[in-house]
Regions:
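Catalytic alpha/beta active-site cores
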Residues: 1-168
């Protein structure tokens, strides 16, 4: 440790003034803990296992990609990782627009009313179902994932309710 760290840090650690966390891994390339830049990976795409993953076209797919990112990060580090669900919020509106288009096409094909109140009610019902399924996917995936080092990912997932604008 003395070769890699300044002498005063080593001394403070040895005297118990500070604690140098994970000093046993310090010299290795592997690192501890990540604040995942989920927003960038979802909005601009990312590469997982040498495969380009484009920006998701729905909330559910964004949730699935999120769990894949968590699995990859967990398999290449030790320690925890953190992300916020607010980065998934823009995909709720993407799904809302996609579902609205589908509902209008279905109702038009069946000769049903395109009254905004009816269309909105159907859209919001389907959207609520997709959001529930997406979050359930994250939950199930995180609970059942096993990394290449034989551990379940250590994840902190923030769910601040006031973090995104109303309606997202």
């Amino acid at each position: 440790m003395r070769v890699l760290l300044p002498e005063d840090i080593v001394k403070a650690h040895e005297e118990g003034i500070i604690h140098f966390h994970d000093s046993d891994y310090f010299a290795q390339k592997e690192h501890n803990c990540d604040l995942i830049n989920l927003e960038d990976m979802l909005q601009n795409g990312t590469v997982i296992s040498e495969t380009m993953i484009e920006k998701p076209h729905s909330f559910f797919t964004a949730c699935n990609v999120t769990t894949q990112i968590v699995a990859q990060v967990a398999s290449n580090q030790y320690g925890g990782q953190t992300f916020t669900l607010s980065h998934l919020a823009p995909f709720v509106d993407i799904s809302r627009k996609k579902i609205r288009k589908q509902v209008i096409e279905e109702r038009t094909a069946c000769g049903d009313s395109l009254d905004d109140r009816i269309v909105n009610k159907v859209v919001e019902s389907r959207l609520r179902s997709e959001v529930k399924s997406g979050i359930q996917t994250i939950q199930y995936q995180l609970i059942t994932l096993m990394t290449c080092n034989g551990q379940a990912p250590f994840v902190t997932m923030f769910m601040y309710l006031d973090e995104v604008p109303e309606g997202q």
